[in-house]
Amino acid sequence: MKRLLFFIVLTLLFFNYCQSQCFTVGADMSYTNSVLDKGGIYRDSNGNITDPFTLFAQKGASMVRIRLWHTPENNIDKCGNPISTNNLDDVVLAFKRAKIQGMKLNMSIHYGDYFNDPSNQKMPKVWMGLSHGILLDSIYNYTYSVLKRLNTEGVTPDVVAIGNETTYGFIYENAPTDGWNWPKDADKYNIAFTAVDNFNKVNNTSIKKAVHFTDNTADWLAGLFYTKSVRNFDIIGISFYPYFSDFDSLQSLGNLITQLKTTYNKEIMIFETGAPWTNTAYADGYGNFMGNNGNFNYPITPQGQKDFLFDLANTVYNAGGIGILYWEPAWVSSGMCDLWGQGSSYENVSFFDFQNGNRPLPAFDIFNFCSTLSLRNQTIKDNILIFPNPASNEIKIIGLQHDVAIKITDVLGRIVINTFSKNNIVDISNIPVGGYTISLFIDNKIVSKKFIKI
């Protein structure tokens, strides 16, 4: 009996910890250091100049994503200078600025000297011509050494993405890629995963491993990866931009997330998204590359941008996703040069109004999504009871008006039951003793309750 009581106390402590966590809403701020270095200015709502990392944290952002390039100095920017943005020193600085504000850290390793994306997965210059075996050693050593440097600097990432939008290949000499090359591509992924695993073991860290796809290819690629034995990861990250998406509704995205989560038992997160708030004004002469919302009918206004983000967050949350990250909301115009221009080709998609001194736009409200979510779901949650609790053979869901889809997960997040309630009763006789979360899908909302199996 004492052992049972001790177990129940530990389980309740774990539940309290879980309940303190919430849906992640964060930002990719990879360019922010360089924007600041080149004179970029950010203001708060009162018009006071402010630090962007401080502002995002104060507004409620809970995670910062930063990309890492191997040797960006191999590229000459539009102003004629070697590019140093997003080298390892820059990543360390960005992570320090984010961590001191209490935000979690998400790193995207591109395994290239510049942007890698669906059309390009070019390896670092220093790896050109290596045999497959030596290339694998290089991938392992590079991945491990990056994590070691970050850990030494006190900014160990919470999530590491192995590759960025790897739609048609991974770490190739050619650009664009020639398509997948199995099993060699599996070797590349798996050696990088092994580097993270070994680092975690040696340093007692718990960095999560992610892959990163686009919305249009995520379903196909997840299946392909499993077929090719690329499975040792925790998170599937998805890029979803209305401008680039083939989808014509957010429900299509929600269906994708639910399918990926239930089929592969992985956490699903939107790693990149973005929507313009204007397409009629410009802060500089660097042409903007995103001027509309594709198949989605959100108006190109500050309120339209905000409405899209809240609808997106609701969709991802209701589908079982763990969060969304907005791509480069702090990329305002400055003297910064990249490979193609000077200034920003994205200021019309940022979270700052360049027509009003770079004051924050309404889109910043998305970082309070957890607060609005809690208020919205509390009434439904308060009306649902699990009885008995603790329970041994079955639980009854009190307060339901009809049968609903349910999912039960253990304390590690593993799905142990995925079914429909029958007469509001769920058979739990075949699951081990322990603490569990039951998630009920009620009227397009997810209501979660905790219970103990004895």
List the model feature ranges, each with a label.
Residues 55-208, 214:
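Substrate-binding cleft and catalytic face of glycoside hydrolase catalytic domains
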Residues 376-454:
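C-terminal outer-membrane/trafficking sorting elements
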Residues 27, 56, 108, 160, ...:
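Conserved, mostly hydrophobic/aromatic
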Residues 21-52:
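Boundary/entry segment of secreted carbohydrate-active catalytic domains
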Residues 37, 280-294, 299-310, 315, ...:
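Aromatic-rich peripheral "rim/lid" segments of glycoside hydrolase catalytic domains that contact
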Residues 50-53, 204-206, 221-293, 310-321:
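Glycoside hydrolase catalytic-domain groove-lining segments
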Residues 38, 118-119, 216-231:
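Distinct, well-ordered alpha-helical segments
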